[in-house]
Amino acid sequence: MEKFSNIAQLKDSGLKVTGPRLKILDLFETHAEEHLSAEDVYRILLEEGVEIGVATIYRVLTQFEQAGILQRHHFETGKAVYELDKGDHHDHIVCVKCGEVTEFHNPEIEALQDKIAEENGYRIVDHALYMYGVCSDCQAKGKR
């Protein structure tokens, strides 16, 4: 996403355009396929020569989540990770050895969840499915 689009996105979300917000949003655009913790954001920004305090990063991540720019997840690692909210629904498979996260969407799983909810008198308004296993790389390395 281009810088003017990020400025518009911040304004449309009701957030003031600041240097730290733009840098953090740019970072998530650049790492759009990754799930980043606050510590990851801090480390990557430092590597790029950008110094933003950890407290500011946590505050911006929370603001972005509340504004619908980011989604927060809590995988087995115990720490929150964030990804851009692209407006599409997907689920996650997480490697318990290396932490790799794979996103997937399966219509059969979605239909089964709807069926189970209906059978129990529910209408699903939202859900999150996290599956945990050992990725092929870790299996090949014998980390079972």
UniProtKB/Swiss-Prot annotation:
It comes from Neisseria meningitidis serogroup C. Pfam families: FUR. It comes from the Bacteria. Keywords: Cytoplasm, DNA-binding, Iron, Metal-binding, Repressor, Transcription, Transcription regulation, Zinc. This is Ferric uptake regulation protein. It is found in: Cytoplasm. GO terms for biological process: negative regulation of DNA-templated transcription; negative regulation of siderophore biosynthetic process. Residues 1-86 are annotated as: DNA-binding. Zn(2+) binds at H35, E83, H92, C95, C98, E103. Its main location: cytoplasm. Gene3D superfamilies: 3.30.1490.190, Winged helix-like DNA-binding domain superfamily/Winged helix DNA-binding domain. Acts as a global negative controlling element, employing Fe(2+) as a cofactor to bind the operator of the repressed genes. Regulates the expression of the fbp protein. Homodimer. Belongs to the Fur family. InterPro entries: FUR, Fur_C, WH-like_DNA-bd_sf, WH_DNA-bd_sf. One of its GO terms (molecular function) is zinc ion binding. GO terms for cellular component: cytosol.
